[in-house]
C-alpha cells in the first residue's frame, strides 16, 4: 500500500471523461481548452490522467494522445486506461483491445491499468476468459506498471475479488460523502474492505457527477458558514482525499474554472478538520430531504437505449426542477435535453438502461416521474 501511495506527489487526478467539448457533441473535444487545462494542471505538480475506452464516444484516448502524450515527456505524467470488459467476447479480445488502446494513446505502456466497471458477473466472465492472466502477462512484459480494477457492486463481491486475486494492486471506488453510508453504493463498506486487504484506493465520483458541486439552500449555507470562499466541490473532494487509504481522488474537470478551483486546495492538501466533518454530516442530512435523482452522468445507460433517450440530461433537467421549481427555465432545460433525442415518455420499459446503471437506479420508474413533470403524461407501457 505504502509504495503505490508514495508514487503520488499530489492526491488530485485528472479524469478525462467530462472534457471540454465544441458545441453539444461529446465526441468533439475542444483540444485548445483541454491543452490549456493540461498545462495548468502539470505546472502545479499534479501528474495523473485517467482515461477509458468508451469516454467521449471513444474519443478521450485520442485526445489524451494529442494534448498530453505528444506534448510532454512520457516520464512527466502517469496515464491510466481501462479494459472495457463488456466488449470482450473471447480471450484474444484482451490483446486486440489493449493494442488498440496503446495506439490510440500513443504509448508503449500504461502506468496504471484497470479492468473497467467490474461487478460479480463481469468478474466471473473475466475469470472464464482468462482476462486476469492475460493482463498479468502484460504487466510482466512492462506494458502495465500497476494493475487494478474499478468497481461497482457490493462490499461482499469486493471481498471475494480481493481474496481471489491478490495480484490486483489497487481498486477504484465510488466514494463521496453522500454515498458514504448508502446501502446501494456501499462506499464505506467497500472502502473498509479495501483497507482490510491493504489495497490502496483511487476515488471516482467524489462530487457525485457534479451533484455535490451545485448545492443550494440549507446545505450550501452550512458550508458557506464554515468558509464563504470555499466551493461545495472543495469539501466533497477533500472528504474523499482525507481517508487514510486513499492514494488519489479523480475529478472529471470540464473547464479551467473547475481545474483552478480543485488545484487551489489540493496543491497543499489539508484533511478535513472535526468542524468540517460535522458540517458534512449535517449537509447529508439536509440532502436526504431533497428527492433528487442521484445520477452521476456516467452515460453507460445511453448507448443501448432503443429510443435514444439521453437519460442523464433528462434527469438533470428533472433535478433542476425539483430544486428550483417547474418554470420557463427548467422546462427549457428539458426541451433542450430531448430536442434531438427521445423524450421520457418514449420509454418502452425494456430495462437495458437499468442493467448498465452503476447506481442501481430504477430508471424506468424515474422516467415516468420526469414525464409527469414535463409532459403532463406518463410513458407508454
Could you tell me what each predicted segment is?
Residues 1-77, 134, 140:
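N-terminal binding-site loop/beta-alpha segment at the start of enzyme catalytic domains
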Residues 4-8, 43, 65-76, 99-108, ...:
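Acidic (Asp/Glu)-rich catalytic clusters
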Residues 18-32, 82-92, 121-124, 220-230:
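Active-site mouth loops of central-metabolism enzymes
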Residues 27-41, 89-105, 153-162, 232-239:
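Short, acidic/polar
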Residues 103-122:
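Active-site groove signature of glycoside hydrolases
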Residues 118-296, 300-309, 313-316, 326-332, ...:
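Beta/alpha (TIM)-barrel catalytic core signal, keyed to glycine-rich beta->alpha loops juxtaposed to Asp/Glu
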Residues 292-308, 343-360:
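Local cysteine-cluster metal-coordination motifs and their immediate loop/turn environment
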Residues 323-350, 376-381:
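Short Fe-S-cluster ligation motifs
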Amino acid at each position: 500500500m505504502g509504495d503505490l501511495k508514495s508514487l503520488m506527489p499530489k492526491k488530485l487526478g485528472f479524469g478525462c471523461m467530462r472534457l471540454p467539448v465544441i458545441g453539444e457533441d461529446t465526441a468533439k473535444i475542444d483540444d485548445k481548452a483541454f491543452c490549456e487545462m493540461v498545462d495548468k494542471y502539470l505546472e502545479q505538480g499534479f501528474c495523473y490522467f485517467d482515461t477509458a475506452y468508451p469516454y467521449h464516444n471513444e474519443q478521450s484516448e485520442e485526445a489524451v494522445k494529442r494534448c498530453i502524450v505528444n506534448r510532454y515527456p512520457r516520464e512527466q505524467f502517469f496515464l491510466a486506461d481501462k479494459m472495457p470488459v463488456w466488449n470482450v467476447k473471447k480471450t484474444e479480445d484482451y490483446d486486440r483491445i489493449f493494442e488498440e488502446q496503446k495506439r490510440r494513446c500513443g504509448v508503449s505502456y500504461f502506468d496504471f491499468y484497470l479492468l473497467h466497471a467490474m461487478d460479480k458477473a463481469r468478474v466471473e466472465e473475466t475469470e472464464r476468459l482468462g482476462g486476469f492472466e492475460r493482463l498479468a502477462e502484460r504487466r510482466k512484459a512492462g506494458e502495465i506498471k500497476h494493475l487494478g480494477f474499478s468497481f461497482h457492486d457490493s462490499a461482499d463481491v469486493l471481498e471475494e475479488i480481493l481474496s481471489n486475486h491478490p495480484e490486483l494492486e489497487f481498486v477504484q471506488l465510488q466514494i463521496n460523502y453522500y454515498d458514504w453510508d448508502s446501502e446501494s453504493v456501499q462506499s464505506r463498506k467497500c472502502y473498509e474492505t479495501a483497507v482490510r486487504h491493504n489495497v490502496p484506493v483511487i476515488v471516482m465520483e467524489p462530487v457525485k457527477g457534479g451533484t455535490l458541486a451545485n448545492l443550494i439552500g440549507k446545505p450550501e449555507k452550512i458550508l458557506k458558514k464554515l468558509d464563504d470562499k470555499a466551493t461545495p466541490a472543495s469539501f466533497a473532494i477533500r472528504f474523499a482525499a482525507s481517508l487514510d487509504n486513499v492514494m488519489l481522488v479523480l475529478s472529471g474537470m470540464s473547464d479551467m474554472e473547475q481545474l483552478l478551483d480543485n488545484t487551489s486546495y489540493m496543491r497543499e492538501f489539508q484533511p478535513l478538520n472535526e468542524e468540517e466533518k460535522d458540517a458534512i454530516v449535517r449537509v447529508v442530512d439536509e440532502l436526504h430531504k431533497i428527492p433528487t435523482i442521484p445520477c452521476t452522468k456516467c452515460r453507460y445507460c445511453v448507448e443501448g437505449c432503443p429510443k435514444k433517450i439521453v437519460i442523464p440530461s433528462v434527469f438533470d433537467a428533472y433535478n433542476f426542477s425539483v430544486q428550483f421549481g417547474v418554470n420557463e427555465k427548467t422546462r427549457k432545460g428539458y426541451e433542450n435535453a430531448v430536442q434531438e433525442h427521445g423524450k421520457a415518455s418514449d420509454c418502452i420499459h425494456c430495462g437495458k438502461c437499468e442493467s448498465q446503471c452503476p447506481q442501481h437506479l430504477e430508471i424506468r420508474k424515474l422516467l415516468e416521474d420526469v414525464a409527469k413533470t414535463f409532459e403532463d403524461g406518463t410513458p407508454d407501457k
